[in-house]
């Protein structure tokens, strides 16, 4: 009976552990005088970046507990959360702005960021497990997250997107080579003009654009949809157990069957190689 009472007391004690420490916010505005080099990172928080004035970087942040549901990890104190909000991890050296990164007091704490920056800023944004959203900012952008989603529009020039298991959606403004990779999510890319390497372990891929150099699209078990418009390119498509469908006129090359098609479309051009292990391929 005594052991049962002790066990019940232990369960009650665990149940009454607060789920959240308090939250605290901060706001900063940094003045810049030229092309900004912007680096943003957070352990498990979200990052949201939008286009702002050309001469400043405006930062709003929310500091909060991370590691929810992990009873053995003590919650950070309200005092520590407030201390980080009072002195957030922001560094500026001229037009180089670094937000997040290493901070000795960030154990069990995450920070969500909402940032306004000049549209032509060089951008490097990374989250350990949160979502990253970018709207109208980023020259030669590099965006990554461990397990969150990436949603980026208005990216200038080439860009590189990488997530461990989330979905990727991106729209390009201008021309440049693109690389987009996810371990198990879906990939959707629009308005591409340049080279492309897009891949996912088991999700679907949907792409619209005009190849100016070779493209490669690959998934382990999903479907792939490519909208080419009036682009001229050479198609090399293969699937392990799905079908290949196109409504475009094509001058075939070599042998073709239900699982492999190769040929020139609109006279040929850069090679678009499309591969899936077990999904369908559509080109239109």
List each model region and its residues.
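Positively charged n-region of N-terminal signal peptides that target proteins for export
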Residues: 1-7
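Bacterial N-terminal signal peptides
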Residues: 7-16
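Acidic (Asp/Glu) and glycine-rich low-complexity loops/linkers
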Residues: 19-127, 133-145, 151-163, 169-181, ...
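Beta-strand-rich extracellular passenger or scaffold domains
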Residues: 132, 205-207, 224-227, 283
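Pocket-lining segment of extracytoplasmic ligand-binding domains
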Residues: 185, 203
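A contiguous binding-surface segment within folded domains or other stable secondary-structure elements
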Residues: 195, 204
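Acidic, glycine-rich calcium-binding repeat modules characteristic of RTX/beta-roll
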Residues: 214-216, 223
